[in-house]
Design a protein with these regions (language model features):
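An alpha-helical, amphipathic repeat domain used for nucleic-acid recognition
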Residues: 1-55
């Protein structure tokens, strides 16, 4: 699945999977995690990302 991001307001990052909005995180979280280096993501990695965001 394609992972893409778009900048939001107030240091927010909007995360999209295959062009569909999935979630919003702040830029501190995004750039402190490994995900900002990814262009694609599988189901297991997506579940890991969602767990990280919700913890």
């Amino acid at each position: 699945m394609e992972l893409s991001v778009k900048p939001g307001r107030a240091q927010k990052i909007h995360i999209y999977i295959d062009g569909e909005y999935k979630m919003t995180v702040d830029s501190n979280f995004w750039y402190s995690e490994k995900w900002h280096n990814f262009n694609s993501i599988d189901e297991e990695e997506l579940a890991e990302l969602e767990r990280s965001v919700n913890s």
